[in-house]
Amino acid sequence: MASGCTYDFIVVGSGSSGGVVAGLLQRAGAKCLLIEAGKHFTASTFPANEADYSAQMFWGGGLEYDTRCLMGFLRGKCVGGGSIVNQALQDRFDDIALGDWKAQSGIDYFTPEAMDPFYTAAEDGIVLQTLPAEQRNRSAQLFIRGLDHAEVGWAALRRGQCDCGVEQGNDCIACLGGCHRDSKQSTLIAYIDPAMPKGLDLAAEFLVDRVEHSASGVKVHGHNGSGPKTYEAKKCILAGGSFGTTQILLKSGFRDKLPALGKCFSMHPQYMSFAEFDEPVDAHKGAFQTVKSSDKGLRKKGYKLENVYAPPVSIAMLYRRGGVDLQRFMKRYRYYACVEVAVRDEATGELSIDRKGKLLIKKEITAQDAARRDDGLELVRSVFAAVGAKSMFQSPMYFGLHLMGGCAIGVDPRTSVVNEAFQVHGCENLYTADTSIFPNAPGINPALSVMALAHKLSRQLVKG
């Protein structure tokens, strides 16, 4: 894998988009290079604790912040990207999400029927399990009871996993730093590892600075520990997600040609509330996140509730106090249940860069976002009260895990960055089909839909 070698395809980013695209192109016989800024971990080398994996497997050493330092963003930085550090939840977008995309983008294939073959292909490429009732810990049971009391619908979650061993005493919360059992169906497991022995080249710990497009191909300029390098390919697929792909295009000078570049950023802002109980809840034990709210009324209102938790360091950060107060709070770690409000936010954020190329994130919580948040938090309080919570605490910190937009897809280059064929407008050899192309927030976990889009793009590229 020498600098200057010409590939059929270069894929930048190895998460739910890039990992899938690279694996599928290799299967089709293409000469392909997969570039990833993070390290190449395996089940035996994932960091053993929260402090180490936060520092080593996420951009910003764990968290990135907006320009006002009011909200934090989590973004995986390792081979496999976010698919390594997420909870492997796999949901299709509904007709509401796809209908809104179709209306804003002007693209006809954003319907459940047209996307079905690509969703099916994505689902067939991994092992899926719907979590059974016997794997619900006490936190999930309390959540269900509270939702039932509030007459809010709920459903079991479906995850990409094959052998978590919960019945043997394994705790899935550890997989937020990578799955040590290779059960989680990350792109590393499902696509990248199988493709590498068959010819897929991998350049890990390589940071792309800019891309240079021409009619004959694309040059990818970047650097690693050995210094600057340039790779060349006939075609390049940017798959760095909302932040990564947008930043590369901004640093490559595309903003002058594409005024929509950096616009339409959204992130499903998430607000975590805790309830203390007299008896241990042990929300960190067993299967992590087994049920969700599934309610047409909440969908219409623009938010959902999720039964989540976090490891100790993250919980301490969410408390946002120190000294004796923090010690007292953390001593009760086993006694808390947590419910999160995830808002389907307006795509009003903007991504830009400073003179040194550093990413700048501007995101306001709009009046509509705030109204949805407040309605959700009020519902959470009633859910906790219904199941006998001793006290309640809402974290003042909020954050985004689903980073979307910046390179919106659409038919009009004045209001979008990527066309219906996933090409950057005016660049026939430069593509993207990751979360950066989302024209607005779907209000649903994006992982499976990104994989479906990756399958659609891959079929198109293979056909030529």
Question: Which positions does each model-derived feature cover?
Answer:
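N-terminal glycine-rich phosphate/pyrophosphate-binding loop and immediately adjacent elements
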Residues: M1-W101, P112-E113, G222, K257-E276, ...
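Glycine-rich loop(s) and the adjacent beta-strand/alpha-helix scaffold that form part
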Residues: L24-R27, K39-F41, P197, F206, ...
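Short hydrophobic beta-strand that contains or immediately precedes a catalytic carboxylate
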Residues: L34-I35, L202-A203, T432-A433
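Dinucleotide-binding Rossmann-like beta1-alpha1 core, especially the glycine-rich loop
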Residues: Q56-F58, C69-P112, E123, Q129-G153, ...
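Conserved redox-cofactor binding core of oxidoreductases
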Residues: D108-V208, Y398, H402, G406-A408
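A glycine-rich dinucleotide-binding beta-alpha-beta segment and adjacent secondary-structure elements
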Residues: L157, D171-G177, R210, L360, ...
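FAD cofactor-binding and catalytic pocket of flavoenzymes
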Residues: L258-L377, H425, T432, S436-P439
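A conserved FAD-binding loop/helix module that cradles the flavin
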Residues: N440-R459
